[in-house]
């Protein structure tokens, strides 16, 4: 089968011929139709410090996918050959306290497909049946291929009650933009999304017309608070950028007793003004992955009830054009990039 592989410990990925995975009794074999390129895949392509310390070589990469079941393990029930599916890319154990309590996404032994084990940038993927998520007929494959990052957005946005609340989102990457769409869909009053990249903000306005976009290099966030008639500030903050400056700005823009969900990852240690957070009585929640499988149920239900994130997909390439796809993603000018394996 064709597969995109990190074959050497250096920049790039390589198209190779790899054996079709053999499945175990509790696995399924999925024929891949569409895959999304993720920021994690860019780290692996660039072979930065994180990738060099995390990813064994060789490794078939990729973890955002949609496809069709073509083989079932002998003990698999509830799934069928020909069924359209996506799936959770975090593979968990069953022995930790978190897993035994049903908090699967917090299992400390979690491994990721395309990072720790062979991934989805291939014509076929082996996946535990436990991780498989069937796709309803009204959700197309290319949306199925971005459910993983949409799940990050949903998990982050729904960390706190948003109904009637004013929400600040820092970072207008694809996940931040989808979080803005989720927040409006969930009943937030005002949703403001900030960035320093004008192209990303233009895309955010295109995907979520009812959100207010702010280029913080050109516009003062305090003026926006006044413009919207917020007496104290925002009720909820969703930090998606990993920027310390953005987090500092968010803390200042929140009401007393405000809440922050953190998904963005800083490039290193950051000097946090904890006294300001304490004296404003701010609640902070770190967000990792997707709740298994509550996040999946919620995002599929929202997609079937009017949530539209299709415009966040800006580039589509055949898999043989993967270099162009990665170049688009690395440019900082794209939304989601989808590769077609059919």
Curated annotation (Swiss-Prot):
- Residues of the active site are 40 (charge relay system), 43 (charge relay system)
Q: Name one GO cellular component term.
A: cytoplasm
The answer to keyword Zinc applying to this record is yes
- EC main class here is oxidoreductase
Q: Where does NAD(+) bind?
A: 175, 195, 200, 263-265, 287-288
Which compartments does it reside in? Cytoplasm
Q: What does this protein do?
A: Catalyzes the NAD(+)-dependent oxidation of L-threonine to 2-amino-3-ketobutyrate.
Q: Which family does it belong to?
A: Belongs to the zinc-containing alcohol dehydrogenase family.
Return the protein name.
Answer: L-threonine 3-dehydrogenase
